[in-house]
């Protein structure tokens, strides 16, 4: 939704939003691309097993995978599992994106007017980015 600057898919503070594959076409200046939104992982073991099969079916169709990781999330074992067992086995490019930087601790220091992190947040964002780089480095 942030990418499209509006509510394109349902969002909930409690429940997962995307349950099936959703595709959106972006067009402009004589070019177009299709963005494929897949359900996120880590909701439950049953859902992860279902999504693993879905990912295996869909990933070969994709040219690039953007794998989103929240800046304030330290529980990355499910992401690591999908990276090692599904994503890394494919032939598409994978780009890990650290999101929701404004929630990085100390979150009360985020500069809302300037839309930028405090020096302490900036350091934590840098460390998070480096940790993601190390964890998801190709073997």
Question: What are these model-predicted stretches?
Answer:
Residues 1-38:
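Conserved G1/Walker A P-loop phosphate-binding module
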Residues 19-21, 35-36, 49-55, 64:
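Well-ordered mid-protein domain cores that form the structural environment of catalytic cofactors
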Residues 27-30, 53-138:
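Conserved C-terminal guanine-recognition region of P-loop GTPase G domains, centered on the G4
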Residues 34, 46, 106:
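Short acidic, gly/pro-rich beta-turn/loop elements at beta-sheet edges
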Residues 39-48, 117-122:
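Flexible beta-alpha connector loops of hexameric P-loop NTPases
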């Amino acid at each position: 939704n942030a990418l499209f600057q509006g509510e394109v898919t349902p969002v909930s503070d409690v429940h997962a939003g995307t349950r099936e594959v959703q595709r959106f076409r972006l067009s402009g200046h004589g070019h177009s691309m299709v963005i494929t939104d897949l359900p996120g992982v880590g909701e439950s073991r049953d859902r992860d097993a279902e999504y693993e099969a879905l990912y295996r079916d869909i990933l070969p169709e994709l040219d690039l995978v953007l794998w989103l990781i929240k800046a304030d999330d330290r529980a990355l074992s499910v992401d690591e599992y999908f990276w090692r067992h599904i994503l890394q086995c494919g032939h598409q490019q994978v780009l890990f994106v650290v999101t929701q930087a404004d929630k990085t601790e100390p979150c009360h220091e985020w500069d809302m007017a300037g839309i930028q992190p405090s020096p302490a947040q900036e350091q934590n964002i840098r460390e998070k980015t480096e940790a993601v780089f190390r964890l998801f480095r190709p073997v």
